[in-house]
């Protein structure tokens, strides 16, 4: 195993590489246990703390640029897995990310993560069906759209897919698709409000001290959208189907009804 305490350009004899034009030398731990793993860091990235482990081979971590406070991640990347962190992603506390078995965890741009959060595309251990011997908890991709707010202690599990502009409530658990511009809460998380938009300015830190309506803030217009109803959208896309009336069946039913009523 190779352990590094700085994030800078690096390459070893096992094909593990780090491409980082900017050096990060504080609160950094990178462990390579396999080969052909790679870290790609944008020149304008801002990293507050990173504990990164590549357990196997062919893993990838991509860290995008950020003009905001340095993020804090504990990341595990397994065989053939990928973790992507978009532009201006922030964390209040430490966020754990786990991706193994070829899956991808992708965080879009301007994602705001609170504290005590976990993003797990796998369960860490295999569960099998006793009769068939087949695995029942496969790892699955996790996708977080742009400008998503993940509340404190919320957890995203395998299969989570969150649309742009949405809010995940405190302590919620997401393991399915959540539409854009909604508030989703609970375990498992369910949509409780649609057609919402949120903005980063803190209620107390940023003026004005009262924000009763949108006139008090500067809108991030690209994320002020109506929620797309997936079921309605799918229905409008379905072609009309012509169903021929089953005349024979109708006639036989009428004849039978006539016999019963004595008509």
Give residue spans per PLM region.
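Short-chain dehydrogenase/reductase
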Residues: 167, 183-185
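Domain-scale signature associated with acetyltransferase and cell-envelope carbohydrate enzymes
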Residues: 1-121, 145-147, 164, 180, ...
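Solenoidal tandem-repeat scaffolds enriched in leucines and small polar residues
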Residues: 137-143, 156
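Short helix/strand-bridging catalytic loops that position acidic/His residues to coordinate divalent metals
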Residues: 129-138
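Beta-rich strand-turn-strand
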Residues: 154-164, 174-175
């Amino acid at each position: 195993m190779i352990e590094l305490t700085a994030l800078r350009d690096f390459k070893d004899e096992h094909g593990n590489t780090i491409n980082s034009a900017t050096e990060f030398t504080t609160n950094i731990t990178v462990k390579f246990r396999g080969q052909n793993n790679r870290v790609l860091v944008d020149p304008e990235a801002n990293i507050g703390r990173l504990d990164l482990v590549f357990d196997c081979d062919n893993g990838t971590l991509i860290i995008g640029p950020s003009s905001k406070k340095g993020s804090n991640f504990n990341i595990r990347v397994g065989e053939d897995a990928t973790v992507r962190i978009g532009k201006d992603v922030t964390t209040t506390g430490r966020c754990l990310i786990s991706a193994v078995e070829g899956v991808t965890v992708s965080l879009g741009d301007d994602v705001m993560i609170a504290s005590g959060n976990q993003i797990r595309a796998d369960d860490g251990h295999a569960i099998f069906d006793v009769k068939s011997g087949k695995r029942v908890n496969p790892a699955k991709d996790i996708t977080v759209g742009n400008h998503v707010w993940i509340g404190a202690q919320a957890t995203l599990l395998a299969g989570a897919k969150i649309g742009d502009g949405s809010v995940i409530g405190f302590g919620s658990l997401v393991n399915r698709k959540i539409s854009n511009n909604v508030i989703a809460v609970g375990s498992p998380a369910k949509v409780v409000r649609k057609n919402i938009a949120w903005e980063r300015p803190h209620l107390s830190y940023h003026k004005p001290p009262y924000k009763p309506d949108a006139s008090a803030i500067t809108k991030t217009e690209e994320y002020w959208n109506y929620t797309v109803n997936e079921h309605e959208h799918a229905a409008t896309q379905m072609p009309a189907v012509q169903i021929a009336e089953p005349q024979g069946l109708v006639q036989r039913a009428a004849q039978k009804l006539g016999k019963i009523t004595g008509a």
